């Protein structure tokens, strides 16, 4: 069949042939360069895998293995101090809460807890955060002032965060007014220090019981963050030497044991029995283990300091909220404050703060 005499058809055929040849050539070049690209990608992946394996090998080496074991054991010992109050609080404390004498005993423990929380904030957490702030920016006045202002902002952030959490939990746990009356013995024990003859059935008192439970959980959250910082300190000390690590662990234990007694009293006030309170206290040890693992994995004192700079003041704000909003109002409701700690109403908090001072120094 003869070709089309139209010149336009001939030019279109030439263009189509040219594009086809060009496409085939590009495909051939792409196919030829594909092995080179694959080899480059494989080489890069091998380098990344080798670096990652070297870093993990350094973490799990024989030298680091001793640090891992000592740091985790030290953090676990600090966490086990939360079970110490079982040896101090009598077995019948749960049933005693239903009596006026039990309420008076609990108020004494709460005043001890108040002093522990305030001493922990102003004699331990905030001075340590201040020292870390000065170490990060020494000799630079502008940066030092800015970091000190950030420290105060973190305290406010911790306080407001715990306020928001308590409001959120209370709104989520709203009960139906038609529910059965509450039989929680703590509601009877904390009614101004007097025993209630009948179980509390008023909605307002049920709200008080809910508030007590939430305050206990908030204190557990603050303790978990505090134990995280303790784990950081223990692991960072063992990274320097075993001697410094052991001294740091003993210092933290001396500080934590009386503090845990106050925390145990706060949990009893929240309505938990002795064994449940001990289990919850022991669960906060997970924060210490996580802090120790974080400190060893970073292997950088600077990274630990930057973490501690905001966790310490944030925890301080949480402890201040628990002390001033949840514990102190119960002590202010006491009709005869001289019964809390004769002959001085503020003797127990002051004595607890004095216990914190030598450990902090």
From Swiss-Prot:
A motif (XEXPHE-motif) lies at residues 255-260. Residues 1-6, 90-108, 172-233, 298-307 are lumenal. This is Zinc transporter ZIP13. Disulfide bonds: none annotated. The keyword Transcription does not apply. The keyword Aminoacyl-tRNA synthetase does not apply. The chain crosses the membrane at residues 7-27, 69-89, 109-129, 151-171, 234-254, 277-297, 308-328, 341-361. Its main location: Golgi. It holds the Pfam family Zip.
